[in-house]
Amino acid sequence: MSELRGYLAEGPRVGIRPFTYEDGAEFIDRVRESKALHHPWLAPPASPDAYAAYAGRLIEDPTKAGFLVCEKGDGPGVEGGAVAGFVNINNIVQGGFLCGALGYGAFAHAAGRGLMSEGLELVVRYAFGPPLRLHRLEINVQPGNAASIALARRCGFRLEGFSPGFLYIDGAWRDHERWAITSEMLKR
């Protein structure tokens, strides 16, 4: 049923689907509306050219997978539901590792409504099943990003460590906490 409606997976309130180039206008509008929510933690693409390059990497690069978390309903967008947020799996490694690094963001209109919890859980389940069949997913979060840490915790990720100067963001090397989940830990 989900595939007939364009979703890779769906829950009671949201479905997840791949990024498309056609989502650019809505995505950019949502990014602009959410600038205060995202700063200083992330900077999603906010122009048509930046979105096209970003979506292109997620669509074409086999070491990445991008998912839009969409509200189920009668709003704008390919599925009729507004885009509530996004979840990307980056640095996908196959072979003996079977791991990927997650990045995600909610849009302001959806923040605090539980939609990203549902969406992230759907992405995790999808990533551990076919076609990706990953074994481990990691999230690296700046220690001050309480909302992202709470989301990781709600979705069953465990804190594994601290990485000083892990990622260059907004002009400086930022410390990160490392959270992870394995297929064995997945909430059944």
Tell me the role of every PLM-derived stretch.
Residues 44-46, 56-58, 101-103, 177-178:
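Short, charged/polar low-complexity linear motifs in solvent-exposed/disordered segments
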Residues 43-44, 67, 168:
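Sparse recognition of residues in long alpha-helices and their boundaries
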Residues 36-56:
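Conserved GNAT-fold acetyl-CoA-binding loop/helix
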Residues 19, 30, 43-50, 61:
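Generic, well-ordered alpha-helical segments
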Residues 1-26, 30-34, 70-188:
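Acyl-donor (CoA/ACP) binding surface of acyl/acetyltransferases
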